[in-house]
Amino acid sequence: MSEKKETPILKAEHLTKMFPVKKRKLIEKQKYVHAAEDVSFEVYPGEVLGIVGESGSGKSTLARTILALTPSTSGQVFYQGEDITDFKVSAGEKRRLRSEIQMIFQDPYASLNPKIKIGNAIAEPMLLHGQASSYAEAKEKIQHLLEVVGLQPAVFDRYPHEFS
């Protein structure tokens, strides 16, 4: 296998997230649940990373830690070579990063408003973050992206509950 020369888009180094368990006694030593422990990976342009595991294995916690929705216990996260661990950057930089790095949580019913069509749910952040200057431009871009991932443009006008 050849060595990668380019900078990874996303990189995690020894990322760990632990949650304290409530103590039952004052003198009891603090215990922790290890939700994600010593996770390292690199994602290069054109690659896809799938995080697979049983329910409760820490997949969502890992994703939330990468996106700094939950602070890490230790380790580092890099986006395009820039250390973004816990988003210790300016408010403007956080806004830029959050427009470029996003996730949809595994329960689509909790992630997507059931009263808003898929196309509108995707168009809103595009318009908010300046990735489209009008609704018509956003719709055109979204329909193209739907085709790229193998979905029909008609998906734009469907509601979340219409997907299996």
Feature locations, PLM:
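ABC-family P-loop ATPase nucleotide-binding domain
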Residues: 1-32
